[in-house]
């Protein structure tokens, strides 16, 4: 959530910066609510002052033995008007809150202004795409004989679900374990196991609600009269970031660095017809997430560090990639700045997103009321960052495509072999003649 004081000081300036993000701020609606709020607060202050004056007058009158009934009646009337004003003010504050909850974060000044992914800026590349001396297959054709089972996944749960079997399932697990070990042993993160189901207020904290309810899987329990609504997490960023919700963290505890391996559940409501083949876009997929909670003056250094942590995974796997700075129109709702890592997929002859690392500054912290005590001992909002380290399914796709062999086998990257019992290659089972 944005700082409402910023809107009050520079409404037109905020509207301009939100327009760069493709969001049209209803300036008239905000101004009208603010005017009404100020009028009520001014009137309430006047009433409070009048009531205080009358209370003193009543005391003096009683000391003189005078009749106070008329003054007492006026005080009672003031009390009734103040209660009505409180109700009205609460309604206005609620409408302001609803308006604020729908506003995306303001982009950092270093973010390129643009409309969509066509305006993103490439920063750097690492690795050289492999030159194949045979016809390259995509991950579906490579993986199906090795244990990718799209047919059973669809039979069990419908489109965009996949079952993994045998060595492919083991390779998927090996990737997640390798990522966790790298982040915990080399990058200083604390491994965390989180709930996969969370309450609605948790999603308000990280910005998925109210705007993206259609992208979430909702879970309801209880009878018709006592229904409890919860949601499956779309990323463990949600649960990891909310661990500091409604708390004041000691400055000495910062930075807090958490990582988790979890399934992620997304309805992909706006993705009809996109990436329908294979594992690129799934309703359920695994991801190793990185979250940092830091002091405001260190958050952009932390963002660079987090990008480096995601890059390290790709480099250790020997997968070519590039780093992209997202433009204002392509960033996620809560982000102030985002870097995407895109891995090379030879069958598509292009780079595809495999990690997204974002600094939300105080946007999520304000919604969660997550604070720390600064050097002056005063509570101050923390900054929160999140990043994929990496999406496990898409990393599996990249390994299958980049490490495929002409005979249909897949070479296991060296860093994964300890997690695969020393296996160097995944071969398709021999078909009976």
From Swiss-Prot:
Positions that bind ATP: 266-268, 353-356
Catalyzed reactions: tRNA(Ser) + L-serine + ATP = L-seryl-tRNA(Ser) + AMP + diphosphate + H(+); tRNA(Sec) + L-serine + ATP = L-seryl-tRNA(Sec) + AMP + diphosphate + H(+)
GO terms, molecular function: ATP binding; serine-tRNA ligase activity
First-tier enzyme category under EC: ligase
Domain of life: Bacteria
Location(s), subcellular: Cytoplasm
GO cellular component, one term: cytoplasm
Binding site for L-serine: 235-237, 289, 388
Keywords on record: Aminoacyl-tRNA synthetase, ATP-binding, Cytoplasm, Ligase, Nucleotide-binding, Protein biosynthesis
A Pfam family this chain is assigned to: Seryl_tRNA_N
Coiled coil: none
E.C. number(s) listed in UniProt: 6.1.1.11
Reported function: Catalyzes the attachment of serine to tRNA(Ser). Is also able to aminoacylate tRNA(Sec) with serine, to form the misacylated tRNA L-seryl-tRNA(Sec), which will be further converted into selenocysteinyl-tRNA(Sec).
Record-linked NCBIfam families: serS
Quaternary structure (record): Homodimer. The tRNA molecule binds across the dimer.
Name used for this protein in its record: Serine--tRNA ligase
Gene label: serS
């Amino acid at each position: 959530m944005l700082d409402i004081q910023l809107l009050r000081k520079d409404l037109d300036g905020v509207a301009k910066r939100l327009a760069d993000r493709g969001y049209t701020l209803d300036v008239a609606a905000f101004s009208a609510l603010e005017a009404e709020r100020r009028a009520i607060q001014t009137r309430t202050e006047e009433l409070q002052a009048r009531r205080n004056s009358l209370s003193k007058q009543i005391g003096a009158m009683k000391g003189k033995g005078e009749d106070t009934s008329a003054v007492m009646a006026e005080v009672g009337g003031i009390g009734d008007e103040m209660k009505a004003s409180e109700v009205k003010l609460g309604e206005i504050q609620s409408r302001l809150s609803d308006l604020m909850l729908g506003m995306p974060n303001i982009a950092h000044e270093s973010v390129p202004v643009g409309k969509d992914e066509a305006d993103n800026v490439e920063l750097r590349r690492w690795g050289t795409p492999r030159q194949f001396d045979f016809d390259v297959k995509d991950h579906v054709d490579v993986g199906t004989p090795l244990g990718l089972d799209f047919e059973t996944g669809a039979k069990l749960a419908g489109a965009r679900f996949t079952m993994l079997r045998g060595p492919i399932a083991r390779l998927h697990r090996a990737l997640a374990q390798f990522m966790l070990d790298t982040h915990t042993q080399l990058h200083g993160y604390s491994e965390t196991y989180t709930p996969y189901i969370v309450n609605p207020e948790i999603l308000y904290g990280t910005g998925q609600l109210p705007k993206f309810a259609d992208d979430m899987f909702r879970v309801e329990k209880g009878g018709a009269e006592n229904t409890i609504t919860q949601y499956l997490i779309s990323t463990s960023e949600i649960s990891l970031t909310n661990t500091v919700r409604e708390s004041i963290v000691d400055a000495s505890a910062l930075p807090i660095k958490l990582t988790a391996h979890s399934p992620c559940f997304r309805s992909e409501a706006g993705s009809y017809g996109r990436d329908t083949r294979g594992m690129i876009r799934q309703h359920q997929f695994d991801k190793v997430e990185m979250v940092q909670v830091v002091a405001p003056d260190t958050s952009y250094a932390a963002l660079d560090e987090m990008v480096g942590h995601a890059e390290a995974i790709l480099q250790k796997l020997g997968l070519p990639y590039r780093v992209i700075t997202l433009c204002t129109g392509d960033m996620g709702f809560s982000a102030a700045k985002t870097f995407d890592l895109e891995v090379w997929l030879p069958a598509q002859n292009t780079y595809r997103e495999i990690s997204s690392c974002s600094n939300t500054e105080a946007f999520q912290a304000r919604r969660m009321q997550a604070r720390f005590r600064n050097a002056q001992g005063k509570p101050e909002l923390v900054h929160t960052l999140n990043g994929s380290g990496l999406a496990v399914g898409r990393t599996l796709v990249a390994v299958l495509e980049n490490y495929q062999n002409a005979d249909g086998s897949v070479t296991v990257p060296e860093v994964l072999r300890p997690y695969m019992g020393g296996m160097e290659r995944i071969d398709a089972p021999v078909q009976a003649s």
